[in-house]
Amino acid sequence: MKREYCLDIDGNVYTIGDLNMFLDNKEPISYPAANPQDPAKPFFTGIIRQEVEIDSVKRSFLLYIPQHYPISGAGIFLYPDDDISAEDYLENSGWKPVAEQTNAALIVLESRSGGWNKKDIQSEISYSEAVFKKSIARVYFSMNEATYYCMGFGNGAYVAAAYAMLNSALIAAVALDGDYDLH
């Protein structure tokens, strides 16, 4: 069953596509052997660059998995300000130590060159949805469904707010520090 969810911003109605969470994963992945001394240790840790394709446009994002990430832990979707690469944000924002301290995975989205596109919010929602689906697919790690968090900074707050409103049943909490007035 396909469900469409809508958000009305300034009289423009935007939809979020099919919320089917099953992905057709085509990436070959080699999993290391489980550690019998520490079977809960994550297979993958550190930074993993990922890519999604929306309407033939490829966009990147980063996963950061802490060294002691639990079997099913929290995930924080971060929307930095305009024109900040996910790598720069991860290295300079102070979020890596927070992730290691709290054992929360970080999913760092990136604006396109020129910044987050408020005029075409649907393309940003589609990007966010693709990142969300790929992140929760349990390929590299497993997030607990009750602990998806969303944070937006600067102009990234606008996109984070729009996406979180469309997915209020999925996002446990949202924090915004920037321009997020959707009117």
Predicted feature descriptions by range:
Residues P39-S56, G114-S128, F132:
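N-terminal-biased segments
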Residues H68-S72, N117-G154, L170:
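Gly/Ser-rich "nucleophile elbow"/oxyanion-hole loop immediately N-terminal to the catalytic nucleophile
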